[in-house]
Amino acid sequence: MEENIDLPIDIDQKKTAQKVRDFFKFNFEHYLIRAGYHRTDLSSPQLDPTGIMSHGGNSAENKMATIFEAQDKCQAVYHAIEQCADSSKQPFRTILKSLYIEELTDWQVAAKVQYSDSRYSDLKRYALCQFADTIDTWKTIYNVKIPELKLFKNRVNIGERSD
């Protein structure tokens, strides 16, 4: 039985969750490397999202603009995680931070949130779907291009082939 977590009714939770897992594995890793960040930098208070972008034509300025953009993408991801629900019944923020910032394993996170493996799997899927929804706000705030992560039932999705 699918649990309502305030997502669009026609979202394909399994496909969306897989797309978000892939995003964290590939895109987010790339953003961190490009930004010169370590995952622990995202949870530390000294991080300063200035949003300063240089628009000159010089090569050094272009490289800095690329770095600033990657830093803004990392900030958007972090804030999207922070915006996710975090209660005893919906520990979505805890799950996402534990997996993708602290790099804990699934079994460690399941123990941390004190749920059985099967219930944890459901909660993880819901957390990934909620992240897919919240990232839209933060990519607008930071004015960055981050791929669409939500996939829908009975629709042709952006970035997917139709059969």
Question: Each predicted region: which residue ranges?
Answer:
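Amphipathic alpha-helical interface surfaces
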Residues: K73-V77, P91-F92, L123
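Short acidic, glycine/proline-enriched loop segments that cap or flank alpha-helices
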Residues: C84-S87, Y115
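Short amphipathic alpha helix immediately N-terminal
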Residues: S87-L104
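Helix-turn-helix DNA-binding module
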Residues: E102-R119
